[in-house]
Structures are given as structure tokens and as C-alpha cells.
Amino acid sequence: MSQLLPVYDVIVVGAGHAGCEAACAAANLGSKTLLITLDMNKIAQMSCNPAMGGIAKGQIVREIDALGGGSGIVTDKSTIQFRMLNLSKGPAMWSPRAQCDRMIFSAEWRDRVEHTDNLDLWQDDVIELLLDKDRVTGVKTRLGISFSSRRVILTNGTFLNGLMHIGRVSFPGGRISEPATYGLSDQLKEYGFAVG
């Protein structure tokens, strides 16, 4: 990133797997793109099972790969174990699965987005969509900075007004030890979107 632009073609909010894929796809197609994330050290973090593949997820990874996405490549670079699942069943049920090193997976994705032309990164919390009548024109962050854009893609995952449950206890959060985000979720509710 050399210098932030006055107007972006695309702003992507959230740098999980979907956000990284969306930002790289837009940038690779020539759109000036800004990817905004809460934490640069947790780009594309594998929260639960650090695996790519299996019958369902494997199909999605292959489709993303066929469209030029990076998940399959990053998986190859971070795999610590590879296994063919369901070998006791017929060939139609066989499916490759790669267990990944979570930290390497995240670091490889960060390297990928940092070295993608037309893609800038910003660490902050988006709290509001900027509107001109019924058209989104950008975003405003918790730091009070406004970014203008022709398009905004929301890939917030579990963080919008997030609530975590451990046993009978519930508390705000996007993931363990990470805060939920507020503001944007309230605005989306005002416009009729289901949040939380």
C-alpha cells in the first residue's frame, strides 16, 4: 500500500476467508480495492477446524480455485497433514482433506493480500455505511475516518453484534478473546436486515 485513495471502486469489510477472496478477486480484475479488518494479525484466521476439504467444503474450495481464488493455494502452502476421507465407502464419497497450520494459513493469506496489486489494507472497525439517498457511497470507521467507494462488500462473519455462549453464560464477542462490533449492525437492522 503506497497511499490511500480518495475514492475506491470496492471496499471489503472483514478479512476472513470470504473477505480475502472478495478483495483479491476485485483487485485482480482491476478494481481499486480497500480491505478493512479489525486485526491485521488475524487475516483469514481458521477459527474452528483448521481443515480445508471434505465433501462439502472441498467442493467450495475447488469452485473458488477454478475461478482464480486463493484458498486452495494458501491451503497447499500451509498443509501439515493430507488425508483421503471416506475410503471405506464408494468412490463417490471419497474426498481429500488438508489439515492446515492455523498460523501459517493466516500468514500466507496476509502475504497474498499485501502483495496483490490494486489492494490496500486498513485496520479499523467499520461502524457505519455512508449513504446518498438509497445508495451506499462508502464507510465510516470507529477512528472517525470515512472512505468513499462505488461498491461495499460486507463479509463480517460472526462479529456483527456478536454473542458467544459458554455453558449457560452469554457475553459479547466475535470469537474467543475478540470483541463484537457494534454500530453497523444497528444500521443494518434499521434497513430491515436480520442481524445476530
What do the predicted segments below correspond to?
Residues L4-A18:
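Beta1/beta-strand and adjacent pyrophosphate-binding region of the FAD-binding site
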Residues V13, L154-T155:
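Redox-cofactor binding/interface segments in oxidoreductases and associated redox assembly factors
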Residues G138-R142:
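Short beta-strand segments that buttress and anchor functional surface loops
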Residues V12, A23-A26, V136:
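Conserved phosphate-binding elements of NTP-dependent enzyme cores
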Residues D9, T137, R150:
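Conserved acidic residues
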Residues Q3, V7, C24-E128, D132, ...:
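Conserved N-terminal/central alpha/beta ligand/cofactor-binding core
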